[in-house]
């Protein structure tokens, strides 16, 4: 009976991969959608949900830090659940890919030493979250840009614009890490700041 339950859970996890069609082709590092400065847990939970269009069309990138998060939060009241990593010492939160977040948490539950009844309950909860998630693939945005050592560094997008991850087209197309602002000439000959 125990082996049967494990096989059922494994088939569900594998079903998550086939449901999204492209998860198996993703890099395991492509997790982060965006960062935001937050003072505490209640600040995270009081934020409005991301708009559906932004959530379902979001790009995801690698975590720019090896820091271990202080907490993991799942906002299930949103139409597309939001997985949030909170870094207490840096007062930062990262919104991660909900498909990958669900799959990775399921994997951790399966590998844990928890009692079977607890595992079944957690996996049922995660399955419900997965069913609310986007059905299509989520695109990879490339490397993120945030200076976690100096989050007040205004040269990094995501730390100066706290408007829930709006990025310029140039930020995504270059795929470059944080860079200092520098003046550059436009085609009209005027100068403008380059973030």
From Swiss-Prot:
Keywords: Disulfide bond, Fusion of virus membrane with host cell membrane, Fusion of virus membrane with host membrane, Glycoprotein, Host cell membrane, Host Golgi apparatus, Host membrane, Membrane, Signal, Viral envelope protein, Viral penetration into host cytoplasm, Virion, Virus entry into host cell. One of its GO terms (biological process) is fusion of virus membrane with host plasma membrane. The keyword Transmembrane helix does not apply. Its main location: virion. It is found in: Virion membrane; Host cell membrane; Host Golgi apparatus, Host trans-Golgi network. GO terms for cellular component: host cell Golgi apparatus; host cell plasma membrane; membrane; viral envelope; virion membrane. Residues 1-25 form the signal peptide. Residues 28-195 form the gL alphaherpesvirus-type domain. Residues 28-157 are annotated as: Interaction with gH. This is Envelope glycoprotein L. It comes from Gallid herpesvirus 2 (strain Chicken/Md5/ATCC VR-987). The gene is gL.
């Amino acid at each position: 009976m125990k082996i049967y339950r494990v096989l059922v859970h494994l088939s569900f996890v594998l079903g998550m991969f086939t449901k999204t069609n492209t998860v198996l082709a993703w890099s395991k590092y492509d997790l982060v959608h965006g960062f935001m400065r937050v003072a505490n847990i209640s600040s995270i939970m009081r934020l409005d949900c991301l708009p559906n269009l932004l959530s379902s069309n979001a790009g995801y990138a690698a975590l720019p830090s090896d820091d271990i998060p202080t907490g993991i939060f799942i906002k299930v009241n949103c139409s597309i659940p939001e997985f949030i990593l909170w870094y207490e010492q840096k007062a930062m939160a990262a919104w991660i890919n909900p498909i990958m977040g669900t799959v990775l948490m399921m994997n951790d539950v399966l590998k844990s030493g928890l009692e079977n009844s607890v595992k079944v309950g957690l996996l049922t909860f995660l399955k419900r979250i997965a069913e609310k998630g986007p059905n299509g693939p989520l695109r990879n945005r490339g490397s993120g840009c945030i200076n976690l050592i100096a989050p007040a560094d205004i040269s990094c997008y995501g730390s100066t614009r706290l408007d829930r991850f709006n990025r310029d087209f140039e930020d995504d197309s270059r795929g470059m890490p944080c860079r200092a602002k520098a003046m550059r000439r436009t085609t009209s000959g005027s100068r403008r700041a380059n973030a």
